[in-house]
């Protein structure tokens, strides 16, 4: 079985939310899946990564997380994901997964795909540099439109409010535990890790959601725990990512500087006093009177007679 995911960066084995969820889940149950870092989403049935290709047999590639979890449960490895959960715990896991999809995932989409500053500075540049031209233009446009459709026209304030509440709910549920269902990871842990890790690790000029996440130390600890135990990077990956760090720092710094400059310009424009309203009203009144008189004379409503004086 092969798991095709987007390449690694920013201290993560992959920066894509779904790819992280698939990878984390496979590692948590020690599945002998072969991981393939790929930048060829067109090979997937839905044109997206991750994709699970089953080498033996003619089974179709899998791109759905729940179906992948079912496959892992039947693979026969010693550690079976979610095996120790009771019926009630499984129902709670499903409910929580649905809650996160509707309240946290939209904010993740907005952060990386709908926020123009983040998109232009990080998302667009990263994907464009990993995909060949002109396919990168097509893919980015398609992915961005898909994200906007999923957001459904929600405003930024509403999206962030739901996400902040979801993060607080996650923090409360985790508490002092190592994982969300005790001391053993479940598919919920893989799901949550996929949402949180990019928010925590990828540098962004608009970082409101990152700041909120960083204010939940147990969630930060959770991400670091999963990363160190199940998803450590190789020396080659660390060196490659280190070589790109200065470039990303430069891009983020420039984006933040441009953002502050634009804010300063906007504030300066707002500080310029408007023309006195009384003067405008007087000028408007005079102009209206002149036009009214001219119109009346032109249409004959007002007649002007000129009498010539007869010389004696």
Swiss-Prot record:
A GO BP annotation: mitochondrion organization
Segments crossing the lipid bilayer: 282-302
Principal localisation: mitochondrion
A GO cellular component annotation in the UniProt record: cytoplasm
Keywords per UniProt: Membrane, Mitochondrion, Mitochondrion outer membrane, Protein transport, Transmembrane, Transmembrane helix, Transport
InterPro entries reported for this sequence: Glutathione-S-Trfase_C-like, Glutathione-S-Trfase_C_sf, Metaxin1/3, Metaxin_GST, Mito_Protein_Transport_Metaxin, Sam37/metaxin_N
Subcellular location: Mitochondrion outer membrane
Gene3D superfamilies: 1.20.1050.10
Pfam families named in the record: GST_C_6 (PF17171), Tom37 (PF10568)
Xref: PANTHER family: FAILED AXON CONNECTIONS-RELATED, METAXIN RELATED
Subunit structure: Associates with the mitochondrial contact site and cristae organizing system (MICOS) complex (also known as MINOS or MitOS complex).
Task performed by this protein: Involved in transport of proteins into the mitochondrion. Essential for embryonic development.
Family designation: Belongs to the metaxin family.
Identification of the protein by name: Metaxin-1 homolog
Species whose genome carries this gene: Caenorhabditis briggsae
Gene that produces this protein: mtx-1
């Amino acid at each position: 079985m092969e798991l095709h995911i987007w390449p690694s960066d920013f201290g993560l084995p992959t920066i894509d939310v779904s790819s992280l969820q698939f990878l984390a889940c496979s590692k948590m149950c020690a599945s002998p899946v072969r991981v393939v870092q790929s930048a060829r989403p067109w090979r997937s049935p839905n044109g997206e990564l991750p994709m699970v290709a089953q080498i033996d047999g003619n089974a179709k590639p899998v791109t759905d997380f729940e179906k992948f979890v079912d496959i892992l449960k039947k693979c026969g490895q010693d550690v079976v994901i979610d095996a120790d959960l009771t019926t009630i715990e499984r129902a709670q896991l499903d409910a929580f997964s649905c809650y996160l999809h509707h309240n946290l995932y939209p904010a993740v989409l907005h952060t990386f795909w709908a926020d123009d500053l983040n998109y232009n500075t990080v998302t667009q540049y990263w994907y464009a540099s990993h995909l060949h031209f002109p396919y990168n233009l097509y893919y980015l446009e398609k992915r961005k439109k898909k994200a906007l459709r999923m957001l459904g026209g929600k405003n930024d304030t509403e999206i962030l409010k739901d996400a902040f509440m979801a993060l607080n709910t996650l923090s409360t549920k985790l508490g002092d535990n190592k994982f969300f269902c005790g001391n053993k990871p479940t598919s919920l842990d893989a799901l949550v890790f996929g949402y949180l890790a990019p928010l925590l690790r990828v540098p962004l000029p608009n970082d409101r959601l990152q700041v909120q996440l960083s204010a939940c130390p147990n969630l930060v600890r959770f991400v670091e725990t999963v990363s160190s135990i199940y998803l450590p990077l190789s020396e080659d990956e660390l060196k490659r990512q280190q070589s790109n760090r200065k470039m990303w720092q430069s891009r983020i710094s420039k984006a933040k500087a441009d953002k502050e400059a634009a804010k300063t310009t906007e504030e300066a424009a707002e500080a310029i006093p408007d023309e006195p309203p009384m003067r405008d009203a007087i000028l408007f009144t005079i102009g209206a009177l002149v036009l009214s008189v001219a119109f009346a004379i032109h249409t004959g409503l007002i007649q002007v007679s000129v009498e010539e004086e007869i010389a004696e």
